[in-house]
Design a protein with these regions (language model features):
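Small-molecule kinase domains that catalyze NTP-dependent phosphoryl transfer to phosphate-bearing small molecules
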Residues: 62, 91-149
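Short, basic/aromatic recognition patches
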Residues: 164-190
Length: 194
């Protein structure tokens, strides 16, 4: 799937040997523009509020595309400790260590083509851009209760803002974010200690 996405972002369609062919700049937004058209069709057919989930945004430019267009767009990242994630991939999907390393490499934003920052997945950057971070421990493969509880929490907040007060961790994160914005560093790419 990642190769198909990279091909579409580079050429505007799925092609064999796409990395050897010329980069077409307008293709970078082909996927999100297509998804955006589908969203508009769904909203038009529903004639009411439509709740839409886009699964697995792995390119930061695609995330930014939706953030710029929809005020109610919330980018969520679901994180698990590396040990739990690799155990999950090994046991349930039967991936080898080499396959897991390849997945990590592909999704890290690294690559050897000249437009990799535009066309390759970059999960790390998408996590940085996330509005909501959800913790999903995978130490019990068939127990998703922690994940479900967090999703219910945030969906309730999206539908009814102010219904649930922020946790202590969320308050500290807000203070850190505010300190970052008040920084004298022009790029605002600084850490904050609270």
């Amino acid at each position: 799937y990642q190769l198909a996405g990279k091909s579409i972002r580079r050429r505007g369609r799925i092609e064999v040997d796409f990395e050897d062919k010329e980069f077409i700049p307008k293709s970078v937004f082909h996927l999100p523009e297509t998804i955006n058209r589908v969203i508009k069709l769904i909203r038009k057919s529903k004639r009411d509020n439509a709740l839409i989930v886009i699964d697995a945004i792995r390119n930061p430019y695609e995330a930014k595309f939706f953030k710029d267009r929809y005020s109610a767009f919330h980018l969520m990242s679901i994180n698990a400790p590396d040990e739990h994630r690799t155990n999950y991939l090994r046991k349930l999907h039967k991936f080898s260590e080499k396959q897991i390393e390849e997945i990590d490499s592909v999704e890290s934003g690294k690559g050897d083509n000249s437009y990799k920052h535009l066309t390759n997945p970059n999960v790390t950057k998408c996590i940085e851009l996330s509005d909501i971070h959800i913790f999903n421990p995978k130490n019990e493969f068939d127990n998703d209760n922690i994940l479900k509880a967090q999703l219910a929490w945030y969906i309730a907040l999206m539908k009814h803002p102010g219904l649930i007060t922020p946790t202590a961790m969320e308050r500290v994160m807000q203070v850190a974010y505010t300190v970052k914005l008040n920084s004298g560093c022009i790029s605002r790419q600084v850490g904050a200690v609270v």
